[in-house]
Amino acid sequence: MKILRFDHMHVKPENYDAFVGNLQKLIGHDVLMNMPMPEYGLQVAYEPFPVGLEAFKPVAESNDSYTFRNATTEKGIFSIAFKVENLAEATAEMEAKGWKKLEEYPNGPIQEALFDTKKDFGFYMELIEYPFDTLAEMFALAAQASQAGQAPQC
């Protein structure tokens, strides 16, 4: 498995709205993304700079992702995501090392998988693969396409 770099972390804050407001005050602008993600039963805020930070709040009891995240009562850092060269190979290696895959998130060009590494590392580990240098680059391309009235070519 080739880990390319630290990509982002997921945080389950005590108070989602206060966390997002304080983060925006800290960085001096609105977070890049703050929106419901009904397919995962979550409200999600994402900011790629200076370090990728994704906060989430479980909001709908309609799926396994909600159930899993809501059952985790601990607040704070939930998982750390590492960008990998090949998610399929990395997943096979993680499972061979005994870390169970908990979820997969296929989202267009972004492919993610979450593993149960909490006992060994103190947090869950997510591996992510995408064809851009950074997620910020992908969001910028999507924004340009949206402004031009086109579908994003991610």
Regions found by a protein language model. Give the residues of each.
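A cross-kingdom feature marking solvent-exposed beta-strand/loop segments within repeated
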Residues: D7, L26, V31-E39, A60-F78, ...
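Vicinal oxygen chelate
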Residues: M1-K2, R5-E14, V44-P50, Y66-E89, T91-C154
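Context-gated lysine
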Residues: K2, K12, K25, K57, ...
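Conserved short beta-strand elements that form part of the metal-binding/catalytic scaffold
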Residues: D30-R69, Q111-L135
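Short, conserved charged micro-motifs
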Residues: D17-G21, L87-A92
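Compositionally biased, intrinsically disordered low-complexity regions enriched in proline and serine
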Residues: D7-V11, D17, G41, E47, ...
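Surface-exposed interaction/gating patches
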Residues: M1-G21, K25-L26, D30
